[in-house]
Amino acid sequence: MFRLWNQLTKPRVTVLVLATVLPGMYLGTTGYPSLTVISITLFGTYLMSSASFILNQYIERERDAVMYRTKQRPIPAGEISPTFALLLGIVVAIVSFGILTYFINLLTAVCALAALLLYVFLYTIWLKPRTEQNIVIGGISGCIGPLIGYAAMANALPMQAWVMFLMIFLWTPAHFWALAIFLKDDYEFAGIPMMPVVSGIEKTVNQIFLYAIAYSLSVIGFYFVDDRMGYLFLLSAIVLTVLILGFAYRLKLSMDKVLAKRFFFFSILHLFLVSIAIVIDSKI
């Protein structure tokens, strides 16, 4: 059962979501956030993220069955029924909303629920099967982590929270398009219009490079938005910017699928390190 839960809920992806919640929590209070509030907020967010992925796999069960990467997921593999997955996703989402509303505040719960609704309805159902820009618009759902964190501490969403939202919004296309390059044949076989399938790898790597530039500018720009950010964050942002732009430029020149996969994983590490830098510098 634990194995099936992990396959349904993508815990490794959820860890990154939770990592983007923490900076919002640390910026949302003048002191240190309560360990109890942190734990409940992260647990509630974990449940809502898990519900999103369960419902995503319910909706995509037929596409998953024809893709090599996903055909062994629990629903297409016949290990659980679609009806059970649907009910499980709904119940987990309700539990998450209840926990966040009762123990934290309604704004936090609404932000978490908005992330689920955007991911399930806007991205999975509407955009993903229809346009190569699916991840640009649909990726909004993955940007809400800082809003959840800030709302949990301040019960408000000031400019700093929205700049962090923008940061992740600009990070998302380069991150996912790199994976789409590596999995181009799989997406093409399943008829999913990811950018490498529709427009080719050359256009995709050019777009990755442009989004990497925009994302890097937003990271450095955060230093000027929040006066709690000091030279530690600025130095970290500059070093990380040089690294990701260098990586994106190499990918632009080579158009290599293996390098695209490496960029995908590096971008995860990059966002994680940016989040850590924000957390540390906000309290020293």
UniProtKB/Swiss-Prot annotation:
GO terms for molecular function: protoheme IX farnesyltransferase activity. The chain crosses the membrane at residues 13-33, 35-55, 84-104, 106-126, 134-154, 163-183, 205-225, 229-249, 264-284. The lineage of its organism: Bacteria, Pseudomonadati, Spirochaetota, Spirochaetia, Leptospirales. InterPro entries: Protohaem_IX_farnesylTrfase, UbiA_prenyltransferase, UbiA_sf. Belongs to the UbiA prenyltransferase family. Protoheme IX farnesyltransferase subfamily. Keywords: Cell inner membrane, Cell membrane, Heme biosynthesis, Membrane, Transferase, Transmembrane, Transmembrane helix. One of its GO terms (cellular component) is plasma membrane. CDD domains: PT_UbiA_Cox10. It is a multi-pass membrane protein. GO terms for biological process: heme O biosynthetic process. The keyword Coiled coil does not apply. It is found in: Cell inner membrane. It catalyses: heme b + (2E,6E)-farnesyl diphosphate + H2O = Fe(II)-heme o + diphosphate. This is Protoheme IX farnesyltransferase. Converts heme B (protoheme IX) to heme O by substitution of the vinyl group on carbon 2 of heme B porphyrin ring with a hydroxyethyl farnesyl side group. Its EC number is 2.5.1.141. Carbon 2 of the heme B porphyrin ring is defined according to the Fischer nomenclature. Its main location: membrane. Pfam families: UbiA. It comes from the Bacteria. Pathway: Porphyrin-containing compound metabolism; heme O biosynthesis; heme O from protoheme: step 1/1.
